[in-house]
Amino acid sequence: MLLMPNKDWHWEYNETCKQLSISLGSEMEFLTPYKTKLLIPDALTATEFNLEHAKFYIKMLETLPKVLHISDAGIVQTALNATAAHFLLQSQMPKSWFFDVSDECVYCEVGKLFQLNCGYSKVLALVVDNGLQAATVMILSQYCQLSDSKSLVQFDTIKVMHNRLHPLRKARQVVAA
């Protein structure tokens, strides 16, 4: 069962964990992975989960099950983190140099999945914010080693130029007659 937003939802900064959270009513809190240094100033105080946030979240709930084969709980977790990343994280400068250039031109939009190639590893990424030449993506794979000293884990965000986004390949089945 997918969790639908209601009037009791609001964003909070969890002082104990030093992370953004969302209160889902009087007895439930969802802790995002986003720490203080990544957040916009408004995210450090209680903030309404407004209509725009709800529309984005619901769009993610509708889109993600069509492209990801994960549990309902995983869909909700991904949608909540994507909503937090879209509205409450500071903007970033592109860090495209970590990723290989794609040979194909892609159409990029929020909610679309792409592959990022980093050396020998390939990671799944969800577009959470899109600009004219670059997109902020949220990593959906468990881990991505960018360099000897830098790595990304699931739900981390990074901004990359559109030419680094590789389209997902669909498995093709050849049937011989």
From Swiss-Prot:
A single BP term in Gene Ontology: FtsZ-dependent cytokinesis
Localization of this protein: Cytoplasm
Assembly information from the UniProt record: Interacts directly with FtsZ.
Record protein name field: Cell division protein ZapC
Any one annotated GO CC term: cytoplasm
Family statement drawn from the similarity comment of this UniProt entry: Belongs to the ZapC family.
Primary localisation category: cytoplasm
Its biological purpose: Contributes to the efficiency of the cell division process by stabilizing the polymeric form of the cell division protein FtsZ. Acts by promoting interactions between FtsZ protofilaments and suppressing the GTPase activity of FtsZ.
Keywords: Cell cycle, Cell division, Cytoplasm, Septation
